Amino acid sequence: HLLSRRQRQMCIRDSSCTITLKDGSSFDCLVPVPGIHMVSNAVAGAAVGYTLGLTADEIKAGIESLPSIPGRNHIIETDHMIILDDCYNANPISMKASIDVLNMAIGRKVAVLGNMGELGDTAEALHAEVGTYAAEQNVDLVCGIGDLTRSLVEEASKGANTEALWFADNESFIQAIPDIIKDGDNVLVKASHGMNFPQIVHALEEL
């Protein structure tokens, strides 16, 4: 093993960890993108840097200067809410990872989830699995957009602490935003690229 890491703190804005290199040196590091999966990515990057001869200080500086990219775990803070913009693409594993990030937030948690593409005959079951996971994580409100999210919404609605709503398309959800999104909400926005969810992010920013 080139190195190890110890998770220290996570929140919806960032994560911190301690990275220990093979030579025994260690350093505290702030990963400016939220999520334990992003910490794992940072550790992988640190391993590559160490192998290439970078110092601990250089590795730390590189990780901590990681830019936030729209559509990829990008945090947007407005006057009314925090938006977790992870809408570039989606699959069942990344959906669950994004729900985990949302679950770090303090306050009401809303997951706006759209179709996941290219799942073939397993699409209905895998969307349902994500809905079950959202309910298990006690997401307060799950909004499914698109035909494939019907099973997701159905399963999410079975959660004792989860409300679930289904919308046929982006436009119908956008029209409902003033009625369902509240001041102080934390809102995850995620779907496959073809769903054009940047449109959803923009509408939330305009609220």
How would you name each of these model-derived features?
Residues D23-G24, D28, P34-L207:
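ATP-dependent carboxylate-amine ligase
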Residues S15-T20:
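Short polybasic amphipathic segments
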Residues H1-I12:
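Single conserved hydrophobic/aromatic residue that forms the stacking wall/gate
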